[in-house]
Amino acid sequence: MAGRSCLELGLFCWVLLAVPVGPQPASSVPGAPLTTLTPPPQSEASMLSLNLGLNFKFHLRGPAAVWGNPVTETHPLSPGLGQESEEEEEGDLRTDPLWELLVGSPGNYLPEWGSAEGSFTPWASSLPPESTSRLSGPTKRPTAHSQPRMGTVTWATALTATAPPTSAPRPHQSELELKFDVALRAGAAPTLGHRSLPLLPSLRASLAEIAGRLGPFGFFGTTVSPLRNFSRQSYPGTTAHPSFAFEVSDSPGLFGTTGSRPPPLLERKFSSPSLLDSVASPSSASVKTTPVQQDPTVSTSGPDELSPASFGNPSTQPGCEPGSCSEPELLDDLGQPPASPLPLFFLTLEADWAEARARWGLAWEAHVYGAGALFGLVALLALLALALLPWRCPPGAPCLALLDLLLLSAGTTRAFPLFYDAYGHRDRLPTLVWLLLQDLPLPCLAAGLGLACLLLARPRTPRCPAGLAALLLLGLGLAAAAALGSAVHRPLRPLRLASRGLHAFLAAFLSGLLLALSCWGGRRRRAGAPLGGAGFKGATPVPQVRSPFAPRESWRRAARTAPVAGTFGLLSGALQGYEVLHALGYGSQAGLEGPWPWWAFQLGLRLGEVGVALPLALLGLYPALCSPRVPRRCWAKLFRLSPGHAAPLLPGGWVPGIPDKEPLGSAIARGDAELLQLCALAGPGPDLLLQGGGCRGFEGAGANPTQSTASSPSSDCTVDFRPPSPINLRRSIEEALCSEALLAPGLFQGPAFGEALPGLGLYRTISLGNKIGAGPSEKSENVPGSPAPPELPSPGAWPPGSSASSGSLCGLSRDSSSMLLCSSPDRPPRCPLVCVLSPPRPSESSPSLPASGSYQALSPPSRDSPEHASELQAEEALLQEQFLDACRQIDELSMGSDTIDL
């Protein structure tokens, strides 16, 4: 005995100096509930490395009672220590009954420790079959121990660290030490020719062990395996056999334990496995399945084991009748497993729909119909904006139309499945259609966020860049390919994770960018000055095409709406990212499974998507409803296919054909600039606008006024009127009155011309004076009292040959700044305006009453008129009253700034 004790002590010290590094956990494959562990082939150059976790593992093993009753009673220790030492010196590990008990059949070997395919722990081969780890709590069924076969190590014995049953006898201390040494020796692995110092740890093996312990399952905490999903109803008549128990590895991860994979019969009971059921551990190739022999009359679901009811199934599991759960029947079922349905969710429901809806009650209805109504509202707003865009044509209409189309698609694809078959609980939709409806709205919302960033970032009209279009097409293509691949080929299911992860990243990034742009409004460059500002003079400037949010009020509305979309976009991206991590096995905590956490998570996803889509729909509706200007209709542009649809632009006579009556003032000479059409040139070309009237940029339109070509006396100051009137009414008014200063402000666009052109006379009066001075029938004498050139010529009668010589006279205005036409005393007073518009409405009111608005009355005739002053005063009063009445009629009958409706 003393020699044997010394030999045992020496062997124990040798093991302490050189102990192998702990192996990685061996994972299971689908359809393999019970497996055996196989050691790797031995090599001649074997070296044991120091195990860093020796003390920790030895502490977890506990006292000698962990060996349990089956080990101490079934297999006596047959080999002697001398024989074992000889085997160790020779390098040939033969099998013995104890070795068969620990690792299985003689042909199987333990994998190399520290490699990619490793066993679980050095002590894993000697663990009892009972399991104390659970995920959902104990069941109410009686306890019984499942007895493994001789020479076979099951997952319950190899991957579970438990305490011995109370009925197990405590073995002798010497047997404990001997078996402890044998377990260490059995776990010894070669280094395949690589020699290292026995006292130094193997860094490669230690890192491999740490990586095996921490990933992919159990990194953040207690994780229910993503390889199962219980969110759909079970097939009728399909039950899980009680002889297959769900085993749980008690290997401590970073913060807790990790649930291993259930057998396929359990997946058949809960018929929605998760997305990554094709993901398996590296050691899945060397796994052999063996069913458990048990007494059929005794139930195997104890408080320390997991039953299907512990995963949320409310239905009672029928027990096996005597002889009904025999081994051949189980093998037949395993040989032809039914095709498991496609996983629809990344987060498991952990219950069937009947129990879940019973727990939710009205919360389920509020979730489904409330979210569906909100998505329907998004679709209606997008449709309304699309209908209004052709009639208003705001700047940036193509980008706004694309934004509305994306929101319409996202709203309809979310609202329809919620109303028709919410989350697929009724199985009304095909799997491929359901997956497409779930995945396609995400790239649409991400592209909508990108378009919103473009609309807010540019002061000018945005154009959809090729990068955003390519990103949209990439997202849509990836989502469609992931849904199609998941429905057709199960190994392609990780594509859904890639698609969802990409959209989560894009949603978070673009939402943060949108928040930054909306908060950057204070430093944003001013898009343009309002019309009629301090720097504006003269004709109406040609409006530049700008961003739909260039006006201040539109920008304020957008700045109040965009941060809401950005905030909810960040929330949606975070939830989608967590969903992807949970599908990979990270992020789950104990107590977060069940119907209510699933309901809250799905509600958060829907609210995040609605919070992004609804503000974006309002953002696209603002320019169509609240555009600061009313431009030309887009439908008119579309249907105006030929130039004949518009009024012809005629130079010279301005009227096609020979006029019936020679217009008033036809003898007025016109320069070359006056032969231009009555339409302002919006494109590049000669500057025909008045002083300060051109839009030379967003700022400083009037800061640097320059003399334009239209500022000369020979130019026509009516070239900015557009479009030309079919009856040339505007030209007739101008020629009859010789000045736009008589018109009310705002009548034909822009401010009052009297304010716009201070100190500038009527340019055509100079040409009139030139005509009078250079006409062949004119007398050469000068009228006394006329100012000297270059001042305006003195007023006088029209030339005898003109058609207006008997109807009007020419006179100076009150401030002597322009020459006006006055009625002739030879005939009764008449006004061409009143004759054209409506009969005169004489009034007995005093002619000295101030004119309404800012109308300017005609000046009295000059002092050189042959008529007496007493006769002319009455005529002047009546003429002024008629003129003011005509101006009022023009204001009442004018429509906008384009034409005059008679």
Swiss-Prot record:
Biased composition (Low complexity): 799-811, 843-854
Record's compositionally biased regions (Polar residues): 122-136, 281-302, 704-717
GO cellular component terms given for this protein: membrane
Membrane topology: Multi-pass membrane protein
Chain segments annotated as transmembrane: 371-391, 393-413, 432-452, 468-488, 501-521
Cross-referenced InterPro entries: PRRT_domain-containing
Modification type Phosphoserine: residues: S642
UniProt superkingdom: Eukaryota
Compositionally skewed regions (Pro residues) per UniProt: 786-798
UniProt entry tagged with the keyword Disulfide bond: no
PANTHER family per record: PROLINE-RICH TRANSMEMBRANE PROTEIN 4, PROLINE-RICH TRANSMEMBRANE PROTEIN 4-RELATED
UniProt name for this protein: Proline-rich transmembrane protein 4
Organism: Mus musculus (Mouse)
Gene, per the UniProt record: Prrt4
